[in-house]
UniProtKB/Swiss-Prot annotation:
Family as reported in the entry's similarity comment: Belongs to the bacterial ribosomal protein bL27 family.
Pfam families per the UniProt record, alphabetical: Ribosomal_L27
HAMAP family linked: Ribosomal_bL27
GO biological process terms on file: translation
Keyword Zinc attached: no
Disulfide feature: none
Ribonucleoprotein recorded as keyword: yes
GO molecular function: structural constituent of ribosome
Protein origin, superkingdom: Bacteria
Region (Disordered): 1-26
InterPro entries: Ribosomal_bL27 (IPR001684)
Key words of the record: Ribonucleoprotein, Ribosomal protein
Name recorded for this polypeptide: Large ribosomal subunit protein bL27
Amino acid sequence: MAQKKAGGSSRNGRDSVGQRRGVKRFGGQRVLAGNILVRQLGTTVHPGVNVGMGRDFTLFAKIDGVVRFEKYIRKRRVLTRVHVEAAAS
């Protein structure tokens, strides 16, 4: 016979999968219209010129171009804004 007592059960051992948020296209990268730039919860990064925002706060490019991030001050807070500038062909 096996000489092992029954082990207790644990209430741990679960973990949810990550939601893959974050910056998807960085400053200086070329993007196409519709490309996702940032996936976020709330407005960590604000939309700038030629950037749209989806209803889940996803930022996306409205035109083909180059990504540029910018810090700016509003009400004594430093915020981040992302722009897409038209690429010179």
